[in-house]
Amino acid sequence: MIDDDGYRPNVGIVICNRQGQVMWARRYGQHSWQFPQGGINPGESAEQAMYRELFEEVGLRKKDVRVLASTRNWLRYKLPKRLVRWDTKPVCIGQKQKWFLLQLMCNESDINMQSSGTPEFDGWRWVSYWYPVRQVVSFKRDVYRRVMKEFINPVILLQESVAARVATPSGPRRKRG
């Protein structure tokens, strides 16, 4: 499904842990890393596509994550001319993406890159929040920068809530006398 401007509707997924690190996934058989992403099927909402891609690419279900935010607008990137398939109709010149920020609520051991018949990724790791902006392939950098700027406040709030829980002593306080 390509829109009238030549862009394929797509969802992107940023998964974070309680420390504010983000999941960085290695493309299958390559040394190229990125966030999970995938196309939106006809008749599918962006949120439905996100949950489908979440399972297909990292083996997680709705119960395993919590949605913290989504981008207000569609973000676009153009493919380099060498990657455009000029012989297909309609020609896809890039992607327009709706991004979702998810908090991992399950154990890391529940992540399964082999959950679909044709895996997109063969490895992953936690990286610092801004690391992907510097490391992603150059034509996606502007979109990644915009996504991470838009999602920084929910991530900071998450980190602060975790820090507050750690700093708060558990159990009743005893009165010293």
Curated annotation (Swiss-Prot):
It comes from Pectobacterium carotovorum subsp. carotovorum (strain PC1). Keywords: Hydrolase, Metal-binding. This is RNA pyrophosphohydrolase. GO terms for cellular component: cytoplasm. The keyword Metal-binding applies. Belongs to the Nudix hydrolase family. RppH subfamily. Accelerates the degradation of transcripts by removing pyrophosphate from the 5'-end of triphosphorylated RNA, leading to a more labile monophosphorylated state that can stimulate subsequent ribonuclease cleavage. GO terms for biological process: mRNA catabolic process. Pfam families: NUDIX. CDD domains: NUDIX_Ap4A_hydrolase_plant_like (cd03671). A motif (Nudix box) lies at residues 38-59. It comes from the Bacteria. Its cofactor is a divalent metal cation. Residues 6-149 form the Nudix hydrolase domain. The gene is rppH. PANTHER family: M7GPPPN-MRNA HYDROLASE (PTHR23114:SF17). Its EC number is 3.6.1.-. InterPro entries: Nudix_hydrolase, NUDIX_hydrolase-like_dom_sf, NUDIX_hydrolase_CS, NUDIX_hydrolase_dom, RppH. One of its GO terms (molecular function) is metal ion binding. NCBIfam families: PRK00714.1-1 (NF001934), PRK00714.1-4 (NF001937), PRK00714.1-5 (NF001938). The keyword Metal-binding applies.
